[in-house]
């Protein structure tokens, strides 16, 4: 059996699909071979956003979008294979997360769309998908799942570490020797900042946090956002656009006597993301020594600096310091979940998700 897997991740940032070709050794240690990104066309991004709130004709719109996503995922696989000089028959499976459009574990479901049967047909490769549903069925949140991979890849006997992922949502994994691993979604990462930046500058994200750095934090707005009850809920917990969307921000802004300048709102959103992350680490990871950051937020210098400022005495660095690229951690993690599925080994950490026990995650769509 080949030990090459393609991991695919398209997250809440909605910037596209990250694909990575990974070889695993017998212990499940990853060796990335090649990677590729296929950006989402704007029409696809808008179609995903339109499915976030409950609305009209959802089933038809969801299935039409699922077909389009399968085509994008197949394109990513094809171009990744071309880049790496590999053939479809060299690959054991594509482990594809799909695109989250609704996450409601308290109602017993989570929805990641993408026509995986069509992806298997187009790619000519086995597809493993639907990784979150089994954890939810077992009473868990179905998220975050990446800490299970991070525990094996990044634990240290000598350093108390937190692995921080800053995508659309931020989440942490506490990796302290001698303690049970925990992990949870802290709150917004880039999601609110990206949406605000696009609305007011036409740019999809704030390059290096420069726009935010030129603004001033608006204390009443920051206080209103920090009053969000989710932030003080105990873990396990998970969140997404179902809570932290444009409507949520509009409600906070609408309650102010007057609207701050857009740049000041951006500065406040950055401070809010950093504060949510720092507060979570300080409360749930006492004695922590280092924070290693992955995801798109690792490239936001202003955000990284603000997190470091709020965590004095702790090292804050991009996860490249531990030997893997920041932007590919989630895609590698889902490749690893595919590798675990093939061996019928559990892929969740109940201490992170709240599930009743370890579960094999995923469903197979044969080529």
UniProtKB/Swiss-Prot annotation:
The name this protein goes by in its record: Anhydro-N-acetylmuramic acid kinase
Primary role: Catalyzes the specific phosphorylation of 1,6-anhydro-N-acetylmuramic acid (anhMurNAc) with the simultaneous cleavage of the 1,6-anhydro ring, generating MurNAc-6-P. Is required for the utilization of anhMurNAc either imported from the medium or derived from its own cell wall murein, and thus plays a role in cell wall recycling.
Coiled-coil ranges per UniProt: none
GO biological process, alphabetically ordered: 1,6-anhydro-N-acetyl-beta-muramic acid catabolic process; amino sugar metabolic process; peptidoglycan turnover
Family of this protein: Belongs to the anhydro-N-acetylmuramic acid kinase family.
Keyword rRNA-binding in record: no
Catalytic activity: 1,6-anhydro-N-acetyl-beta-muramate + ATP + H2O = N-acetyl-D-muramate 6-phosphate + ADP + H(+)
Residues the entry annotates as binding ATP: 11-18
Pathways per UniProt: Amino-sugar metabolism; 1,6-anhydro-N-acetylmuramate degradation; Cell wall biogenesis; peptidoglycan recycling
InterPro entries, per the entry: Anhydro_N_Ac-Mur_kinase, ATPase_NBD
Entry EC no(s): 2.7.1.170
GO molecular function, one term: phosphotransferase activity, alcohol group as acceptor
Top-level EC class: transferase
Alphabetic keyword roster: ATP-binding, Carbohydrate metabolism, Kinase, Nucleotide-binding, Transferase
Pfam families noted in UniProt: AnmK
């Amino acid at each position: 059996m080949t030990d090459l897997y393609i991991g695919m991740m398209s997250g809440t940032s909605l910037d596209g699909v990250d694909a990575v070709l990974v070889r695993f050794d017998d212990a499940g240690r990853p060796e990335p071979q090649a990677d590729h990104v296929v950006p989402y066309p704007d029409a696809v991004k808008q179609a995903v956003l339109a499915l976030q709130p409950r609305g009209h004709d959802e089933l038809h719109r969801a299935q039409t979008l699922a077909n389009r996503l399968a085509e994008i995922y197949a394109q990513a696989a094809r171009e990744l294979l071309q880049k790496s000089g590999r053939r479809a028959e060299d690959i054991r499976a594509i482990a594809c997360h799909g695109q989250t459009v609704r996450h409601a574990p308290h109602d017993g479901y989570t929805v990641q769309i993408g026509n995986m049967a069509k992806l298997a047909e187009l790619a000519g490769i086995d597809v493993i998908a639907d990784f979150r549903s089994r954890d939810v069925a077992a009473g868990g949140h179905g998220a975050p799942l990446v800490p299970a991979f991070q525990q094996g890849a990044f634990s240290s006997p000598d350093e108390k570490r937190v692995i921080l992922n800053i995508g659309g949502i931020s989440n942490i994994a506490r990796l302290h020797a001698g303690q049970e691993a925990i992990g949870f979604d802290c709150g917004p990462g880039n999601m609110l900042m990206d949406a605000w930046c696009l609305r007011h500058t036409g740019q999809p994200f704030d390059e290096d946090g420069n726009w935010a750095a030129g603004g001033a934090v608006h204390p009443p707005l920051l206080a209103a956002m920090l009053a969000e009850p989710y932030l003080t809920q105990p873990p396990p917990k998970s969140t997404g656009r179902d809570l932290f969307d444009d409507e949520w921000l509009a409600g906070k802004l609408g309650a102010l006597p007057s609207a701050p300048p857009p740049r000041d709102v951006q500065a406040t959103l950055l401070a809010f993301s950093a504060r949510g992350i720092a507060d979570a680490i300080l409360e749930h990871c006492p004695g922590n020594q280092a924070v290693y950051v992955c995801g798109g937020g690792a490239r936001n210098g202003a955000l990284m600096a603000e997190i470091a400022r709020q965590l004095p005495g702790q090292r804050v660095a991009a996860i490249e310091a531990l030997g893997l690229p920041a932007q590919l951690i989630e895609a590698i993690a889902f490749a690893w979940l595919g590798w675990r599925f093939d061996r019928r080994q559990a892929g969740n950490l109940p201490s992170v998700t709240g599930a009743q026990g370890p579960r094999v995650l995923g469903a197979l769509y044969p080529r």
